[in-house]
Amino acid sequence: MRHYEIVFMVHPDQSEQVPGMIERYTGSVKEAGGQVHRLEDWGRRQLAYPINKLHKAHYVLMNVEAPQQVIDELETTFRYNDAVLRSLVIHTKHAVTEASPMKAAKEERKPLAEVENNDFEDAEE
């Protein structure tokens, strides 16, 4: 089986459907004997340029190991699902399990906010 990186962008009005979509897509990969190595829901983000007069979209990143038949099925599903604005499937040489730069940057910012909050509590005492 080959390794793939899949990114798809969902219409912002359909954000509540994203968890169901993720479950459906990962389920089809696992049913075919594949594995999901990385799954990141980046949430709503600003688009670089408008798509269908929209300026935001809900982003999802998946790194999977799956047979070609499942990938073809996913691409067809993306193509005919009106909620999916754009999708990209890339073949990779090996499994990617570490956090993406988007996720790593988000995690680096969280502790900074907690540190500032702790400094504020110390100043009150």
UniProtKB/Swiss-Prot annotation:
Residues 96-125 are annotated as: Disordered. Residues 104-113 have a biased composition (Basic and acidic residues). Residues 116-125 have a biased composition (Acidic residues). GO terms for molecular function: small ribosomal subunit rRNA binding; structural constituent of ribosome. Keywords: Ribonucleoprotein, Ribosomal protein, RNA-binding, rRNA-binding. Modified post-translationally by the addition of C-terminal Glu residues by the RIMK enzyme. One of its GO terms (biological process) is translation. Gene3D superfamilies: 3.30.70.60. PROSITE patterns: RIBOSOMAL_S6. The keyword Coiled coil does not apply. GO terms for cellular component: cytosolic small ribosomal subunit. Belongs to the bacterial ribosomal protein bS6 family. Binds together with bS18 to 16S ribosomal RNA. PANTHER family: MITOCHONDRIAL 28S RIBOSOMAL PROTEIN S6, SMALL RIBOSOMAL SUBUNIT PROTEIN BS6M. This is Small ribosomal subunit protein bS6. It comes from Haemophilus influenzae (strain ATCC 51907 / DSM 11121 / KW20 / Rd). The gene is rpsF.
